[in-house]
Amino acid sequence: MQAEIISVGTEIILGQITNTNARYLADQLRQLAIEAPWQTNVDDDPARIKQALATAKERANLIFICGGLGPTEDDRTMAAVGDYLGRQLRLDEDYWQQIKAQLEARSISATVSPENIRQAYYLAGGTPLSNPTGLALGVYLKDGAHTYVVLPGPPHEFKPMVDQSLLPHLKADFGKGYQTYSALLHFVGRPESLLMQELASLGLDERLVVTSYVQPDEIQVRVTLHDVAKEEATSLLEQAIAKIARQEADYYIGRGAGVSMASQLVALLKEKGLKITGAESLTGGLFQATLCSVAGASEVFDGGFVTYAASAKEQLLGVPVETVRQYGVVSKQTAEAMASGCQQKMGVDVGLSFTGVAGPDDLEGHPAGTVWLGLAIKGRPVESHLLRLPGQTRQFVRQQSVQEGMRLAYNALR
């Protein structure tokens, strides 16, 4: 079984949007052991959509067409697929009534926007795929030796339709005889190449497929097994994960979807009944925003400080003027004074500070990417850590500083 993903949209061709749909769908297919070696991008022109379908038909059995199902003039995908396959479009009357009800609930008259009826059409002979978060129907159609799947383009509609409406069909038709098991692992603070070299040296079972994905704030590693009995697969995966976690103890932060350095730090603070605060200079509040993106962060975080200027560090945190004058703001001494200052001012257990040079220019003779982290934990000596992140963008330096700061606190507390 081989699949092809055709993504429709002039915005994709022009580079105006990132095609996250194809990536998500390819990952779902991989978990079903469905190979998808081809991905095609095409604009909204019906002739080119049909040409892409003809090419896909020659090399794939399962063909996905994503995007172009809306109510506007350039949403032509369903009609183009129907024309190519010689299938008429049929109106799902019940679904059209649902669309009208939703439009009226938004104070939009269906008579004012009659083009919305396009979203209730599907291919004759196919199975409509409901849209849990939008209006346009998808379709699942078997046509001889080929299966065609038409899906919406907006990611907030695409993913729920794949998860709730499409996957049951794929599992029923193509999942038989295939068993795929995998685990998603998360790492912070380790370069991808070095991490993968170390994992390769662990002597893991040769049936395990280990792949890595670089994200802005972490490295994700997926460990996968194909066509193995469930009990054996579970045992092999757990053994491998335990070995990896021991090897990379300082950098491994957890497994599964939704895991992040921030979520793990919040969970650890909750477990220990501790509260944290922050004092940020170059990161400008990014640490506190990242922490507060985790549900339940209010249990471990009351507030903090953004002290960009030296005067703010002195006035709000109590950093001695002499410390700044003698050592500068980009220094071990200032980072430690900021950490202890915020921890004491807020009366909490942990204070984490960030001071440094985001770039692009040098500061106080320090090159861009020089960052000091300070960590003050009640009852312990204040500590600090130097980061060197040369040749990176301002945003990368800020993001990486936050991740490394959270990792510093996490490892110190666990």
Curated annotation (Swiss-Prot):
> SUPFAM superfamilies, alphabetically?
CinA-like, Molybdenum cofactor biosynthesis proteins
Give the InterPro entries listed for this entry. CinA (IPR050101), CinA-like_C (IPR036653), CinA_C (IPR008136), CinA_KH (IPR041424), Competence-induced_CinA (IPR008135), MoaB/Mog-like_dom_sf (IPR036425), MoaB/Mog_dom (IPR001453)
Q: What's this protein's family per the entry? A: Belongs to the CinA family.
Task: Name the NCBIfam families for this protein.
Answer: cinA_nterm, PncC_domain, PRK00549.1
Output the HAMAP family linked to this UniProt entry: CinA_B
The name on file for this protein is Putative competence-damage inducible protein
Q: Which organism is it from?
A: Limosilactobacillus fermentum (strain NBRC 3956 / LMG 18251) (Lactobacillus fermentum)
User: What gene is behind this protein?
Assistant: cinA
